[in-house]
Structures are given as C-alpha cells and as structure tokens.
C-alpha cells in the first residue's frame, strides 16, 4: 500500500529488504515502473545503511519484531537501529524521518517489548527532533488473515502480554488508513509529532 501510494504521487522509493530474491517480484508489482529501487541490506550492516542515506530525502522506518531471535533482539531492532537512523538523518540533512512505534508503549512499562519501543522513540527525538513518530494499533489488510495470523502468533510466543489486568482491547487500523496518515505527514510537512493511529472499532 505504501509503495503504491508514494509512486502514484511521483515519489521515487528505495525499498530495503533482507532478501531481494524472495521479495523483489512482489515489491515491483506494487508501484509504477521506474519509481522503485530495491536494495538488499542487513540492518546490522552500518556501512550499507549509511550509503543509502546519501541519496535520500525522507526515511520511513517500518521495521519491528514481536519476538526476539538471535541478533534480532528488542533492543537492537527497536532502540539501537532507530537511534542510528535518527543520527544518519541529521548527518545527511534529511527532510523527514517517520518512525512506526506501537500504541500504548508509554503505559506498558512492564513489557520489555514496550520499553524497547519507548527507548527507540526517545533516541529518535533526541537525535533528530523533526521526526514524526506513529503509534499504530494492530495493523491489518484485506489480503491477510488477521485472525489466523494472530492465533499463530499466540501459539509461537512463550508469553503474550495482556495489559491492564487482562482487559486489553484492540482498535485495529487498516493498512491503507495508516498509509494515508504517512502520506499526509509527508505532503503536509508535519514534523515533531507523536501520533496515535487506531481504527474505528474496538475488539
């Protein structure tokens, strides 16, 4: 959705993926020809990440994890990597950094996941104050199976946090609505904001 929206509005997009052979075809079909560049990179390869910033105007960070695996720890992905992006945004004088965090991270301080997200937000605002941070609720789209994926997640995680004494409610947001928010931030030059993004229904 995001690639399609940006390329339809004449933005040239560099998409960073860790597996270009697996993702290339799907990514290319999401936007206008000539407006998409696909780059394979490991986010732990700081030299490669630095090189990508030399020709960028805007950075949109969508990377996040729900469980840890080897080097993909909450601290590395949610705190240290966003901190690097913010520093590089400042060094290369980017127009904007848009970062996806998560809804409720400032309240759920007992969760390591939430703490890492909140620490990432603090690092971003400290190093590149012009950044806009989005805190979306659960994101879904018509071409995924939200219920099945959610149940799969519950089966895979050793512990699934239910905040507020187990009375957790969700207000899922459709991916196209989240994309519209991101596009409006870019087109309307919205800076230095923390925006909570939710849908219209409570589950």
Q: Language-model segments: what does each one mean?
A:
Residues 12-14, 65-66, 76-127, 131-137:
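Conserved Rossmann-fold NAD(P)-dependent oxidoreductase catalytic core, especially the SDR/UDP-sugar
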Residues 19-21, 201:
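Residues in the short beta-alpha loop(s) of Rossmann-like NAD(P)-binding domains
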Residues 44, 105, 139-141, 178:
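Conserved sequence/active-site signature of Rossmann-fold short-chain dehydrogenase/reductase
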Residues 111, 132-153, 168-169:
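Flexible, glycine-rich beta-alpha linker
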Residues 44, 77, 170-176, 203:
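Residue-level signal for the nucleotide or nucleotide-sugar donor/cofactor binding architecture
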Residues 152-173, 177, 181-198:
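A conserved pocket-lining segment of Rossmann-fold NAD(P)-dependent short-chain dehydrogenase/reductase
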Residues 1-12:
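N-terminal Rossmann NAD(P)H-binding glycine-rich loop of SDR-like oxidoreductase domains
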Residues 21, 25, 30-84, 88-91, ...:
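NAD(P)H-binding glycine-rich loop region in Rossmannoid oxidoreductase-like domains
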């Amino acid at each position: 959705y995001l690639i399609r929206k940006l390329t339809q509005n004449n933005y040239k997009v560099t998409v960073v993926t860790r597996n270009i052979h697996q993702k290339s075809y799907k990514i290319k079909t999401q936007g206008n020809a000539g407006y998409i560049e696909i780059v394979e990179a490991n986010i732990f390869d700081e030299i490669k990440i630095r090189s990508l910033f030399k020709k960028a105007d805007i950075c949109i960070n969508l990377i996040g994890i729900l469980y840890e695996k080897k080097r993909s720890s909450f601290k590395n992905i949610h705190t240290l990597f966003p901190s690097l992006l913010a520093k590089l945004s400042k060094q290369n004088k980017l127009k904007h950094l848009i970062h996806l965090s998560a809804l409720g991270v400032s309240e759920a301080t007992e969760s390591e996941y939430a703490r890492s997200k909140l620490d990432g937000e603090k690092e971003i605002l400290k190093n590149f104050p012009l950044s806009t941070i989005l805190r979306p609720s659960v994101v879904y789209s018509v071409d995924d199976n939200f219920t099945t994926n959610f149940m799969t997640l519950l089966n895979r995680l050793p512990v699934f946090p239910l905040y507020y004494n187990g009375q957790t409610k969700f207000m899922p947001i459709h991916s196209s609505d989240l994309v519209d928010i991101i596009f409006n931030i870019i087109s309307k030059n919205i800076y230095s904001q923390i925006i909570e993004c939710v849908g219209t229904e409570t589950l």
